[in-house]
Protein backbone atom coordinates (compact mmCIF):
# COMPACT_ATOMS: atom_id res chain seq x y z
CA UNK A 1 0.00 0.00 0.00
CA UNK A 2 2.81 2.39 0.88
CA UNK A 3 4.52 1.54 -2.43
CA UNK A 4 1.34 2.38 -4.31
CA UNK A 5 1.05 5.77 -2.66
CA UNK A 6 4.67 6.59 -3.37
CA UNK A 7 4.33 5.67 -7.02
CA UNK A 8 1.17 7.75 -7.37
CA UNK A 9 2.83 10.77 -5.73
CA UNK A 10 5.80 10.45 -8.06
CA UNK A 11 3.57 10.38 -11.11
CA UNK A 12 1.68 13.43 -9.89
CA UNK A 13 4.93 15.27 -9.24
CA UNK A 14 6.23 14.45 -12.69
CA UNK A 15 3.00 15.57 -14.35
CA UNK A 16 3.11 18.84 -12.44
CA UNK A 17 6.70 19.42 -13.55
CA UNK A 18 5.78 18.79 -17.17
CA UNK A 19 2.83 21.17 -16.90
CA UNK A 20 5.03 23.89 -15.40
CA UNK A 21 7.63 23.40 -18.16
CA UNK A 22 4.94 23.69 -20.83
CA UNK A 23 3.61 26.88 -19.26
CA UNK A 24 7.12 28.35 -19.07
CA UNK A 25 7.75 27.40 -22.71
CA UNK A 26 4.48 28.99 -23.85
CA UNK A 27 5.25 32.16 -21.92
CA UNK A 28 8.70 32.31 -23.52
CA UNK A 29 7.17 31.89 -26.98
CA UNK A 30 4.62 34.64 -26.31
CA UNK A 31 7.31 37.00 -25.03
CA UNK A 32 9.43 36.30 -28.12
CA UNK A 33 6.50 36.87 -30.50
CA UNK A 34 5.53 40.09 -28.75
CA UNK A 35 9.12 41.33 -28.84
CA UNK A 36 9.47 40.42 -32.54
CA UNK A 37 6.20 42.11 -33.46
CA UNK A 38 7.16 45.23 -31.51
CA UNK A 39 10.50 45.41 -33.30
CA UNK A 40 8.85 44.79 -36.67
CA UNK A 41 6.15 47.40 -36.03
CA UNK A 42 8.77 49.92 -35.00
CA UNK A 43 10.78 49.24 -38.13
CA UNK A 44 7.69 49.65 -40.35
CA UNK A 45 6.58 52.95 -38.82
CA UNK A 46 7.70 55.71 -41.19
CA UNK A 47 8.63 59.00 -39.62
CA UNK A 48 6.40 61.93 -40.68
CA UNK A 49 7.97 63.68 -43.64
CA UNK A 50 7.29 66.13 -46.45
CA UNK A 51 8.91 66.72 -49.83
CA UNK A 52 10.28 70.16 -50.63
CA UNK A 53 10.93 71.14 -54.25
CA UNK A 54 12.57 74.35 -55.49
CA UNK A 55 12.31 75.23 -59.19
CA UNK A 56 12.53 78.18 -61.56
CA UNK A 57 10.55 79.39 -64.59
CA UNK A 58 7.43 77.30 -64.03
CA UNK A 59 9.36 74.16 -63.20
CA UNK A 60 11.78 74.22 -66.13
CA UNK A 61 14.89 74.36 -63.89
CA UNK A 62 15.11 72.23 -60.76
CA UNK A 63 17.27 73.45 -57.88
CA UNK A 64 16.25 71.01 -55.17
CA UNK A 65 13.99 68.05 -54.47
CA UNK A 66 14.36 66.58 -51.01
CA UNK A 67 12.40 64.58 -48.46
CA UNK A 68 12.52 66.18 -45.01
CA UNK A 69 11.47 64.60 -41.72
CA UNK A 70 9.13 66.71 -39.61
CA UNK A 71 8.20 66.46 -35.95
CA UNK A 72 4.89 68.31 -36.20
CA UNK A 73 3.97 71.97 -36.12
CA UNK A 74 6.63 73.12 -38.59
CA UNK A 75 5.64 75.81 -41.05
CA UNK A 76 6.48 75.89 -44.74
CA UNK A 77 8.96 78.65 -43.93
CA UNK A 78 10.64 76.52 -41.24
CA UNK A 79 11.42 73.72 -43.69
CA UNK A 80 12.50 76.10 -46.45
CA UNK A 81 14.91 77.76 -44.02
CA UNK A 82 16.24 74.31 -43.09
CA UNK A 83 17.23 73.36 -46.65
CA UNK A 84 18.13 76.70 -48.25
CA UNK A 85 19.68 80.11 -47.62
CA UNK A 86 16.83 82.61 -47.70
CA UNK A 87 16.17 86.29 -47.16
CA UNK A 88 12.76 87.68 -46.26
CA UNK A 89 11.05 91.07 -46.27
CA UNK A 90 7.83 92.57 -44.91
CA UNK A 91 8.47 91.39 -41.39
CA UNK A 92 9.82 88.00 -42.42
CA UNK A 93 6.64 86.75 -44.06
CA UNK A 94 7.63 87.22 -47.72
CA UNK A 95 10.52 85.30 -49.30
CA UNK A 96 12.72 87.66 -51.28
CA UNK A 97 15.52 85.27 -52.24
CA UNK A 98 16.40 81.59 -52.13
CA UNK A 99 20.03 80.57 -52.54
CA UNK A 100 20.81 83.94 -54.11
CA UNK A 101 17.93 83.97 -56.62
CA UNK A 102 16.23 87.25 -55.77
CA UNK A 103 12.95 89.00 -56.58
CA UNK A 104 13.19 91.25 -59.64
CA UNK A 105 11.10 94.23 -60.69
CA UNK A 106 11.94 96.23 -63.80
CA UNK A 107 9.15 98.78 -63.35
CA UNK A 108 6.19 99.61 -65.58
CA UNK A 109 5.23 96.73 -67.84
CA UNK A 110 8.65 95.15 -67.49
CA UNK A 111 9.80 91.96 -65.85
CA UNK A 112 8.39 91.04 -62.45
CA UNK A 113 9.78 87.90 -60.87
CA UNK A 114 9.06 86.52 -57.42
CA UNK A 115 8.98 83.32 -55.43
CA UNK A 116 5.62 81.54 -55.21
CA UNK A 117 4.90 78.42 -53.21
CA UNK A 118 2.45 75.60 -53.77
CA UNK A 119 1.22 72.96 -51.37
CA UNK A 120 0.36 69.71 -53.15
CA UNK A 121 0.00 71.53 -56.44
CA UNK A 122 -2.17 74.41 -55.13
CA UNK A 123 -0.94 77.98 -54.82
CA UNK A 124 -0.99 78.57 -51.07
CA UNK A 125 -3.54 81.05 -49.80
CA UNK A 126 -1.49 82.08 -46.74
CA UNK A 127 2.09 83.14 -46.11
CA UNK A 128 4.73 80.47 -45.63
CA UNK A 129 5.04 81.24 -41.91
CA UNK A 130 1.33 80.51 -41.47
CA UNK A 131 0.99 77.19 -43.28
CA UNK A 132 1.57 74.24 -40.93
CA UNK A 133 2.84 71.21 -42.78
CA UNK A 134 1.23 67.76 -42.69
CA UNK A 135 3.02 64.49 -43.33
CA UNK A 136 2.97 63.68 -47.05
CA UNK A 137 2.73 67.31 -48.17
CA UNK A 138 4.70 68.53 -51.18
CA UNK A 139 6.00 72.05 -50.57
CA UNK A 140 6.94 73.43 -53.99
CA UNK A 141 8.63 76.80 -54.49
CA UNK A 142 8.92 78.27 -57.99
CA UNK A 143 10.56 81.51 -59.14
CA UNK A 144 8.80 82.96 -62.16
CA UNK A 145 7.66 86.03 -64.06
CA UNK A 146 4.17 87.26 -63.25
CA UNK A 147 3.96 90.48 -65.27
CA UNK A 148 0.84 89.15 -67.04
CA UNK A 149 -1.08 88.89 -63.78
CA UNK A 150 -2.08 85.39 -64.90
CA UNK A 151 -1.95 83.93 -61.43
CA UNK A 152 -1.24 80.20 -61.72
CA UNK A 153 -3.38 78.84 -58.88
CA UNK A 154 -2.67 75.15 -59.57
CA UNK A 155 -0.05 73.05 -61.35
CA UNK A 156 -0.03 69.48 -62.64
CA UNK A 157 3.60 68.78 -61.74
CA UNK A 158 3.04 67.46 -58.21
CA UNK A 159 0.72 64.66 -59.39
CA UNK A 160 -0.98 62.66 -57.85
CA UNK A 161 -1.40 65.68 -55.62
CA UNK A 162 -3.65 67.32 -54.63
CA UNK A 163 -5.91 64.29 -54.92
CA UNK A 164 -3.97 62.38 -52.25
CA UNK A 165 -3.21 64.87 -49.46
CA UNK A 166 -5.21 67.99 -50.38
CA UNK A 167 -4.44 71.17 -48.47
CA UNK A 168 -4.03 71.73 -44.75
CA UNK A 169 -4.82 68.08 -44.09
CA UNK A 170 -8.21 68.24 -45.83
CA UNK A 171 -8.90 66.40 -49.10
CA UNK A 172 -11.98 67.19 -51.17
CA UNK A 173 -13.83 64.31 -52.81
CA UNK A 174 -12.51 63.62 -56.29
CA UNK A 175 -14.59 62.79 -59.37
CA UNK A 176 -13.48 61.86 -62.86
CA UNK A 177 -16.09 63.33 -65.20
CA UNK A 178 -16.01 61.87 -68.69
CA UNK A 179 -17.76 61.81 -72.04
CA UNK A 180 -19.04 58.37 -73.05
CA UNK A 181 -16.36 57.85 -75.68
CA UNK A 182 -13.66 58.19 -73.01
CA UNK A 183 -15.02 55.60 -70.58
CA UNK A 184 -11.94 53.37 -70.94
CA UNK A 185 -9.55 56.29 -70.40
CA UNK A 186 -11.51 57.36 -67.32
CA UNK A 187 -11.52 53.82 -65.93
CA UNK A 188 -7.78 53.47 -66.47
CA UNK A 189 -7.13 56.76 -64.70
CA UNK A 190 -9.40 55.81 -61.80
CA UNK A 191 -7.59 52.50 -61.31
CA UNK A 192 -4.19 54.20 -61.51
CA UNK A 193 -5.11 56.79 -58.87
CA UNK A 194 -6.67 54.17 -56.59
CA UNK A 195 -3.40 52.23 -56.67
CA UNK A 196 -1.70 55.39 -55.41
CA UNK A 197 -4.12 55.64 -52.50
CA UNK A 198 -6.61 58.15 -53.91
CA UNK A 199 -10.32 57.66 -53.20
CA UNK A 200 -12.06 58.58 -56.45
CA UNK A 201 -15.37 58.15 -58.27
CA UNK A 202 -16.41 58.29 -61.92
CA UNK A 203 -19.44 59.85 -63.58
CA UNK A 204 -20.63 61.05 -66.96
CA UNK A 205 -20.97 64.78 -67.54
CA UNK A 206 -24.77 64.48 -67.46
CA UNK A 207 -24.56 62.93 -63.99
CA UNK A 208 -22.48 65.70 -62.41
CA UNK A 209 -24.56 67.53 -59.82
CA UNK A 210 -24.25 71.25 -59.11
CA UNK A 211 -23.01 70.45 -55.60
CA UNK A 212 -20.27 68.14 -56.94
CA UNK A 213 -19.30 70.71 -59.54
CA UNK A 214 -18.76 73.31 -56.81
CA UNK A 215 -17.23 71.19 -54.04
CA UNK A 216 -15.34 68.25 -55.58
CA UNK A 217 -11.94 67.94 -57.15
CA UNK A 218 -12.81 67.40 -60.81
CA UNK A 219 -10.86 65.71 -63.59
CA UNK A 220 -12.68 66.52 -66.84
CA UNK A 221 -12.02 64.23 -69.81
CA UNK A 222 -13.34 65.28 -73.23
CA UNK A 223 -12.44 67.31 -76.31
CA UNK A 224 -12.44 71.11 -76.38
CA UNK A 225 -16.01 71.05 -77.72
CA UNK A 226 -17.31 70.02 -74.28
CA UNK A 227 -19.49 72.72 -72.70
CA UNK A 228 -17.68 72.89 -69.34
CA UNK A 229 -14.23 72.72 -70.91
CA UNK A 230 -15.21 75.45 -73.40
CA UNK A 231 -16.37 77.62 -70.49
CA UNK A 232 -13.00 77.23 -68.78
CA UNK A 233 -11.13 77.87 -72.02
CA UNK A 234 -13.06 81.12 -72.53
CA UNK A 235 -11.70 82.32 -69.18
CA UNK A 236 -8.14 81.05 -69.66
CA UNK A 237 -6.54 84.37 -68.76
CA UNK A 238 -8.43 84.62 -65.46
CA UNK A 239 -7.52 81.02 -64.61
CA UNK A 240 -3.81 81.64 -65.14
CA UNK A 241 -3.60 79.36 -68.17
CA UNK A 242 -0.98 79.78 -70.88
CA UNK A 243 -2.75 77.36 -73.24
CA UNK A 244 -5.85 78.44 -75.18
CA UNK A 245 -7.95 76.93 -77.98
CA UNK A 246 -9.30 79.39 -80.57
CA UNK A 247 -11.62 76.93 -82.27
CA UNK A 248 -9.03 75.84 -84.79
CA UNK A 249 -5.62 75.87 -83.13
CA UNK A 250 -4.20 75.24 -79.68
CA UNK A 251 -2.17 78.35 -78.88
CA UNK A 252 0.52 78.62 -76.22
CA UNK A 253 1.74 81.84 -74.64
CA UNK A 254 5.11 82.48 -73.07
CA UNK A 255 5.45 84.05 -69.62
CA UNK A 256 5.37 87.55 -71.17
CA UNK A 257 2.01 86.91 -72.84
CA UNK A 258 3.42 86.64 -76.34
CA UNK A 259 2.14 83.92 -78.64
CA UNK A 260 4.67 81.11 -78.52
CA UNK A 261 3.52 78.14 -80.60
CA UNK A 262 0.32 76.91 -82.23
CA UNK A 263 -0.80 73.33 -82.90
CA UNK A 264 -3.59 72.07 -85.14
CA UNK A 265 -4.02 69.12 -82.78
CA UNK A 266 -2.60 67.74 -79.56
CA UNK A 267 -3.44 66.48 -76.11
CA UNK A 268 -3.56 68.99 -73.25
CA UNK A 269 -3.43 68.73 -69.45
CA UNK A 270 -4.26 71.86 -67.43
CA UNK A 271 -5.11 72.62 -63.81
CA UNK A 272 -6.73 75.41 -61.83
CA UNK A 273 -8.26 75.79 -58.42
CA UNK A 274 -11.99 75.20 -58.87
CA UNK A 275 -13.57 78.37 -60.35
CA UNK A 276 -17.08 77.05 -59.59
CA UNK A 277 -16.35 77.08 -55.87
CA UNK A 278 -18.61 79.87 -54.51
CA UNK A 279 -15.68 81.20 -52.47
CA UNK A 280 -13.54 81.69 -55.58
CA UNK A 281 -10.61 79.87 -57.11
CA UNK A 282 -7.92 80.69 -54.56
CA UNK A 283 -9.23 79.17 -51.36
CA UNK A 284 -7.23 75.92 -51.64
CA UNK A 285 -10.30 73.72 -51.23
CA UNK A 286 -10.56 71.93 -54.57
CA UNK A 287 -9.21 71.89 -58.11
CA UNK A 288 -10.29 71.28 -61.69
CA UNK A 289 -7.98 69.36 -63.97
CA UNK A 290 -8.73 69.28 -67.69
CA UNK A 291 -7.56 66.39 -69.86
CA UNK A 292 -8.51 67.47 -73.35
CA UNK A 293 -7.46 67.92 -76.96
CA UNK A 294 -8.75 68.57 -80.45
CA UNK A 295 -9.37 64.96 -81.49
CA UNK A 296 -10.43 61.76 -79.74
CA UNK A 297 -6.91 60.39 -80.10
CA UNK A 298 -5.44 63.56 -78.55
CA UNK A 299 -7.55 63.12 -75.40
CA UNK A 300 -6.73 59.43 -75.06
CA UNK A 301 -3.02 60.16 -75.45
CA UNK A 302 -3.16 62.85 -72.76
CA UNK A 303 -4.97 60.44 -70.43
CA UNK A 304 -2.32 57.79 -70.97
CA UNK A 305 0.38 60.20 -69.81
CA UNK A 306 -1.29 60.37 -66.40
CA UNK A 307 -1.88 56.62 -66.30
CA UNK A 308 1.45 55.24 -67.48
CA UNK A 309 4.03 58.05 -67.77
CA UNK A 310 3.20 60.64 -65.12
CA UNK A 311 6.88 61.07 -64.18
CA UNK A 312 7.18 63.00 -67.45
CA UNK A 313 4.97 65.82 -66.15
CA UNK A 314 6.88 66.23 -62.88
CA UNK A 315 7.20 69.91 -61.87
CA UNK A 316 5.26 71.09 -64.95
CA UNK A 317 2.60 73.80 -64.86
CA UNK A 318 0.72 72.43 -67.89
CA UNK A 319 1.57 70.46 -71.02
CA UNK A 320 0.72 69.85 -74.66
CA UNK A 321 1.44 66.43 -76.14
CA UNK A 322 1.86 66.56 -79.92
CA UNK A 323 3.66 64.20 -82.27
CA UNK A 324 4.75 62.11 -79.27
CA UNK A 325 6.57 65.09 -77.79
CA UNK A 326 5.68 66.75 -74.48
CA UNK A 327 5.81 70.54 -74.56
CA UNK A 328 5.94 72.17 -71.13
CA UNK A 329 3.88 75.36 -71.01
CA UNK A 330 4.81 78.08 -70.28
Where do the protein language model's features map onto the residues?
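Transition segments tied to proteolytic processing and entry into folded domains
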Residues: 20-24, 38-39, 57-60, 64-66
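Eukaryote-biased recognition of intrinsically disordered, low-complexity regulatory segments
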Residues: 44-67, 161-165, 169-173
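Hydrophobic, secondary-structure "cap" segments at the distal end of domains
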Residues: 77-131
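Solvent-exposed alpha-helical segments and adjacent loops
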Residues: 38, 135-330
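N-terminal Sec-pathway targeting helices
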Residues: 7-24, 32-34
Amino acid sequence: LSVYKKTKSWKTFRQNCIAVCIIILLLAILIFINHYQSDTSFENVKEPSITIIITQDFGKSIFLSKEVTIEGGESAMDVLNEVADITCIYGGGFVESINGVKSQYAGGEGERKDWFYYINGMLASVGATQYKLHSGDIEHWDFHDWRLDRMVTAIIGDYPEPFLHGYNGRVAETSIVYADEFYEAATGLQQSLEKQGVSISMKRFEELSEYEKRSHNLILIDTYENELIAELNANADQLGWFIEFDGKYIITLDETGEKDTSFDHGGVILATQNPWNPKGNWHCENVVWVVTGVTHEDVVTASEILITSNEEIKNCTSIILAKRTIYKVP
